[in-house]
C-alpha cells in the first residue's frame, strides 16, 4: 500500500499554497459560549471555487508526468469537485473534461465551463456519469481524477491540517466532514503525524453514514441508499484506498440529522453572516454533540456553494422548526368586525401577521363559523405559545396548522 508521509504532505502544502487562499481561522464567540469550548472555523467556503476541492486537484495534477498532462484529465462530478478540477487544470495549463449528469443545474454546468473545462452531459445520476467518464478515459488516454479515492488527492486536501496546526498549534479537536473520505483522510493523517494527541472527529449525515457503517464492520461496505440534504456528502460507499487511514487516524464518527443542518444554517447566517453549504454545516452541527469543555476545537467548513432556491427553502424550514413562523386556524362568527378583533389581539401580543386566509366554506352553515388561517412571525416557542394562549382565552379555539395542511390540537 502506498504510504502517506509527512514529506509528501509538506510538499503538497507548498505546491497548493501557490494557487489557494490560506483561509484564516475565525473564532466563534457564539458557538464558544454555546458549547463551553473555544470554537474556531476553518472557512473553506471562502476558498477559490467556494470549496476545498481545488487543493487535492491541483496537487494531483502536479504529480502527473508531462505525457499524462499532455493527454489531459477527466473526472465526473455534479458539484464542488467538478469546479475544483476545472480550476486546477486551468492554472496548470492542462486540458480537463468533466462529465456531469444530465440533471445537473445549468448554473453548475456554466461555472465549470467558466473555469475552462469541457463539459460532457451523460447519464441521469452520478454513477452513470462516472461510468461514461471512465469509458472516455480509456478511449482517449485521459487521467481520471477521482473525487476522493485517490491518495494524491487526499494528500492535497491534507494541506488544510497543515494550515490549522500552524495557526493554532494547541488545537485539541478537528471536526471534518466525511463523504467518501478524501478530506478526512488527508486531515486526520497529517494531524496525527504532527501531533498524535489531536483528536480528529469525522462527521457524516445520518442518512449517508457509509464510513461509520464500514468502520463498524471492519471493511468498506455499500449503503443500499442515501437520504440527506447534504448532497456533497451523500456517498453510498467510501474510498477503498482511504479506509485504512480512516481506521487508523479518526478517533470517532458523529452523525447529523437534516434538521440539525437546518438549524446550523440559520446559526451561521445570523451569528457569522456566512453562507455554508449543507455538507460544510456537518461540523457546525456536530459541536453540540461533543461531550467536552474548555477545549480548542476547529470545525472545517468544507464549502459554501448553495443555490438560492435551496437556501430559501432551508431558511423557511428553519424558521418553522424554531417556531419563528407558524400558522394557526381560528373559527369566527361570519359578521363584520370579527377580523379586526383578532388583529387587535395579535397586535397586543406582538405577533406579526405574514398572511391571512379566510375560508367561508369550512362549515355547512357559514353563519355558524368561518375559518381564518393566520401565518405569523414570533420570537420563538415561548412567544408562539403566548399568542396561542391569548387566542384560547379569547374563545377562538385555535388549532396549529402544520405546513403540510394537517392540524395539531392545542
Spans of model-derived segments:
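PLP-dependent amino-acid enzyme catalytic core
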Residues: 1-410
Amino acid at each position: 500500500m502506498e504510504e502517506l508521509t509527512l514529506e509528501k504532505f509538506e510538499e503538497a502544502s507548498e505546491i497548493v499554497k501557490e494557487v489557494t487562499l490560506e483561509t484564516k481561522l475565525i473564532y466563534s464567540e457564539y458557538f464558544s459560549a454555546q458549547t463551553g469550548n473555544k470554537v474556531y472555523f476553518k472557512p473553506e467556503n471562502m476558498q477559490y471555487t467556494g470549496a476545498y476541492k481545488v487543493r487535492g486537484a491541483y496537487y494531483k495534477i502536479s504529480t502527473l508526468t508531462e505525457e499524462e498532462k499532455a493527454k489531459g484529465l477527466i473526472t465526473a462530478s455534479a458539484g464542488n469537485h467538478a469546479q475544483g478540477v476545472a480550476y486546477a487544470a486551468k492554472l496548470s495549463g492542462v486540458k480537463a473534461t468533466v462529465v456531469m449528469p444530465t440533471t445537473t443545474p445549468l448554473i453548475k454546468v456554466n461555472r465549470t465551463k467558466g473555469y475552462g473545462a469541457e463539459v460532457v452531459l451523460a447519464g441521469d445520476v452520478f454513477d452513470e456519469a462516472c461510468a461514461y467518464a471512465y469509458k472516455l478515459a480509456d478511449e482517449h488516454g485521459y487521467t481520471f481524477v477521482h473525487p476522493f479515492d485517490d491518495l494524491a488527492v487526499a494528500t492535497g486536501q491534507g494541506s488544510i491540517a497543515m494550515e490549522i496546526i500552524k495557526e493554532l498549534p494547541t488545537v485539541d479537536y478537528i471536526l471534518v466532514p466525511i463523504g467518501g473520505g478524501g478530506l478526512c483522510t488527508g486531515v486526520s493523517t497529517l494531524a496525527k503525524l504532527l501531533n498524535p494527541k489531536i483528536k480528529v472527529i469525522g462527521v457524516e449525515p445520518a442518512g449517508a453514514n457509509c464510513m461509520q457503517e464500514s468502520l463498524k464492520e471492519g471493511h468498506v461496505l455499500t449503503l443500499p441508499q442515501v437520504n440527506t440534504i447534504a448532497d456533497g456528502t451523500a456517498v453510498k460507499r467510501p474510498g477503498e484506498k482511504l479506509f485504512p487511514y480512516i481506521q487508523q487516524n479518526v478517533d470517532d464518527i458523529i452523525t447529523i440529522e437534516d434538521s440539525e443542518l437546518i438549524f446550523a444554517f440559520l446559526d451561521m447566517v445570523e451569528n457569522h453572516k456566512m453562507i455554508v453549504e449543507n455538507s460544510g454545516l456537518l461540523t457546525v452541527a456536530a459541536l453540540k454533540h461533543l461531550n467536552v469543555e474548555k477545549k480548542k476545537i476547529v470545525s472545517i467548513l468544507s464549502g459554501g456553494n448553495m443555490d438560492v432556491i435551496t437556501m430559501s427553502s432551508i431558511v423557511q424550514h428553519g424558521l418553522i422548526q424554531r417556531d419563528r413562523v407558524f400558522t394557526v386556524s381560528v373559527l369566527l362568527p361570519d359578521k363584520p368586525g370579527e377580523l379586526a378583533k383578532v388583529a387587535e389581539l395579535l397586535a397586543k401580543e406582538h405577533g406579526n401577521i405574514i398572511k391571512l386566509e379566510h375560508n367561508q366554506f369550512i362549515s355547512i352553515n357559514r353563519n355558524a363559523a368561518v375559518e381564518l388561517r393566520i401565518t405569523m412571525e414570533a420570537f420563538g416557542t415561548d412567544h408562539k405559545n403566548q399568542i396561542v394562549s391569548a387566542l384560547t382565552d379569547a374563545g377562538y379555539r385555535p388549532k396549529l396548522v402544520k405546513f403540510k395542511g394537517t392540524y395539531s390540537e392545542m
